[in-house]
């Protein structure tokens, strides 16, 4: 049986922390779908299409990764893809409480889909898309925080020269 995992998020933008979780998941599962969730309660910086393109470029060297978007419940998407796992990254203990609530709800919706938590590498434990955007907004270097394609996209959006 093929093991299929879903790694979801807003990825606005994808960071090296996200990429670390995706790469590590891709070593464990036969296929990993990286899914941009279109959350109507968030005002995204990058459009869904831009985020999909950035993720495709950032993951192009990982053959068992596929990139997609979804606007509904994650469990419904997982069922549609015959996925048996949801892959989540944890930066700190504070992430766990929120993730536990989401996992409990997902299990209530479909008890056959398991959630796997991966602790982020220490170097990314502080990292979030919000922090990346804030640093980039004021012209700070994000070279150690995001893939090169994302750095270029941020510079373009904020119209700041590359450092």
Curated annotation (Swiss-Prot):
What does the record give as cofactor? Answer: Mg(2+)
Write out the entry's keywords from A to Z.
Answer: ATP-binding, Coenzyme A biosynthesis, Cytoplasm, Magnesium, Nucleotide-binding, Nucleotidyltransferase, Transferase
A matching Pfam family:
CTP_transf_like
Any one GO BP annotation for this protein = coenzyme A biosynthetic process
Where do the annotations place ATP binding?
10-11, 18, 89-91, 99, 124-130
Q: Where in the cell is it found?
A: Cytoplasm
Which of this chain's residues are annotated to bind substrate? 10, 42, 74, 88
Give the Gene Ontology MF terms in alphabetical order: ATP binding; pantetheine-phosphate adenylyltransferase activity
Question: Does the keyword Transferase feature in the UniProt annotation?
Answer: yes
> Which pathway does it serve?
Cofactor biosynthesis; coenzyme A biosynthesis; CoA from (R)-pantothenate: step 4/5
Write down the SUPFAM superfamilies for this protein, in alphabetical order.
Answer: Nucleotidylyl transferase
Q: Which domain of life is it from?
A: Bacteria
Report the main location listed first in the record.
cytoplasm
Keyword Transmembrane helix listed: no
Q: What do the Gene Ontology cellular component annotations say? A: cytoplasm
Which reaction(s) does the protein catalyse, per the Swiss-Prot or TrEMBL entry? Answer: (R)-4'-phosphopantetheine + ATP + H(+) = 3'-dephospho-CoA + diphosphate
Q: Name the residues annotated as site: Transition state stabilizer.
A: 18
Record's function text: Reversibly transfers an adenylyl group from ATP to 4'-phosphopantetheine, yielding dephospho-CoA (dPCoA) and pyrophosphate.
**Family, as annotated:** Belongs to the bacterial CoaD family.
| Subunit record text | Homohexamer.
Name under which the protein is recorded: Phosphopantetheine adenylyltransferase
